[in-house]
Design a protein with these regions (language model features):
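Positively charged N-terminal leader segments that act as targeting/secretion signals
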Residues: 9, 30-41
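N- or domain-start disorder-to-order transition segments that initiate the globular core
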Residues: 57-94
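Conserved phosphate/anionic-ligand binding catalytic regions in large, soluble enzymes, centered on
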Residues: 102-115, 373
Length: 402
């Protein structure tokens, strides 16, 4: 350690002078002298220590606390009722108390809130038409897990330009969910991180944990505390065991780190979620057919779980070709019509217009068409919902006469 004069940091405060008697009184001459230079302490060893914290962080911005966003977009009585009733319906479907089919249908991801609202209004008519046979929930995905890189969703980059206005994205997401649920349409979404649920989860009727995160301990812990039913997808390679393990893990209490509505770091303790299930989404090969359903149910039995399966018509089951969702859904409908009660739900990627488009700077986007995975168009979507509703009716007849 060394002492330097005039150094700019690490200064020791000068001790206060004590006046105890005549001998300590300064003369006028002494008082006119310039003050002694202040002495500064400098830890040379510490100054030479390498920097090990935040070395790859370019910038840290403040995140608006969840409570602020919740006050801006208050959950209305109508939105709360719609969300609650759909959660209850899904609970009954999962526990074999309702023979309807849960259908999660909508765009691969939301990038245009206006198109999303138009889709929601059109879907609402079909939800009402098929209410006796289907519990239709709109797929409203704001976050996109990426295998490598790419646009990560409306919350992460709402302006689609790499500006990453996340505070804006969170507000847009909550506002859209509120608008959708207020017209009577329950919403489903994927939960990708530990913080964003505090901004939107009260408006979500059903949640998903994706294939890339099903094996993640933190996502299993999150699911154990979510207020909505949650589906776990099988792994990207088709591994079913990790999904059934996730369902078991999420059914138990957990303690983990998250944030409060006020935005403070917190320890969260959960009760466990009894409304979790597996989603067959394909992998190296599809797994939507009857043989795959049988295999999944054997895996469920090995895990001491009831076999209640949702089948994703897209992703690995469509081999990434959106038009393949139609034959996949017809195969699933045939299984249902033959009386298979183990299939409790399906997922469909659907938009106003079929296909997909690339996000190209400076190039206008086609309204109502996906910028992530390809989707089937509106007419095909409506047809598939009708066929699924007919399959549920047929299943009832088969089971009633069995």
């Amino acid at each position: 350690h060394i002492f330097l004069q005039g150094f700019t940091f690490g200064a020791f405060p000068q001790p206060a002078e004590r006046v105890t008697g005549p001998d300590t009184l300064k003369s006028t001459e002494d008082s006119n002298k310039p003050p002694e230079p202040r002495r500064f302490f400098f830890d040379l060893e510490r100054a030479m220590q390498p920097i090990t914290d935040d070395v790859r962080i370019r910038e840290i911005k403040e995140l608006t606390p969840p409570s602020h966003v919740l006050r801006e977009f208050v959950c209305s009585e109508r939105a709360a009722q719609v969300t609650y009733e759909s959660r209850q319906a899904i609970h009954r479907i999962l526990h074999d108390m309702d023979d309807r089919l849960l259908v999660i249908i909508g765009p691969c991801s939301i990038h245009d809130t206006k198109a999303a609202m138009q889709y929601a209004k059109q879907l609402m008519g079909l939800r009402e038409r098929y209410a006796q046979d289907l519990e239709i929930v709109m797929r409203v995905y704001f976050e996109k897990p990426r295998t490598t890189i790419g646009w990560k969703g409306l919350i992460n980059d709402p302006d689609l330009d790499g500006s990453f206005q996340i505070n804006k994205g969170l507000r847009l997401a909550r506002e859209l969910l509120l608008n959708i649920t207020e017209i009577g349409m329950p919403a489903g979404t994927e939960f990708l991180d530990m913080i964003s649920p505090q901004y939107i989860a009260d408006l979500v009727a059903w949640g998903a944990i994706g294939a890339r995160t099903t094996e993640s301990q933190s996502h299993r812990e999150l699911a154990s505390g979510l207020s909505c039913p949650v589906g776990f997808k099988n792994g990207t390679d088709g591994n079913l065991r990790i999904a059934f393990d996730a369902v078991k893990a999420a059914s138990h209490p957990h303690h983990f780190l998250s944030v409060t509505k006020g935005g403070h770091s917190a320890i969260v303790s959960t009760n466990g979620n009894e409304d979790c299930h597996v989603i067959l989404r394909g992998g190296k090969t599809p797994n939507y057919d009857a043989a795959s359903v049988d295999a999944a149910c054997k895996e469920a039995a090995n895990a001491a779980l009831a076999c209640r399966l949702m089948i994703d018509a897209s992703h690995g089951n469509s081999q990434k070709k959106p038009e393949n969702q139609i034959p996949v859904l017809r195969n699933i409908a045939a299984q249902i019509a033959e009386g298979d009660a183990r299939i409790m739900g399906v997922m469909i990627e659907s938009h106003l217009h079929a296909g997909r488009q690339d996000l190209v700077p400076g190039k206008p986007l086609t309204y109502g068409q996906s910028i992530t995975d390809g989707c089937i168009g509106w007419d095909d979507s409506a047809q598939m919902l009708q066929e699924l509703a007919d399959a549920v009716k047929a299943r009832r007849l088969v089971l009633e006469t069995a």
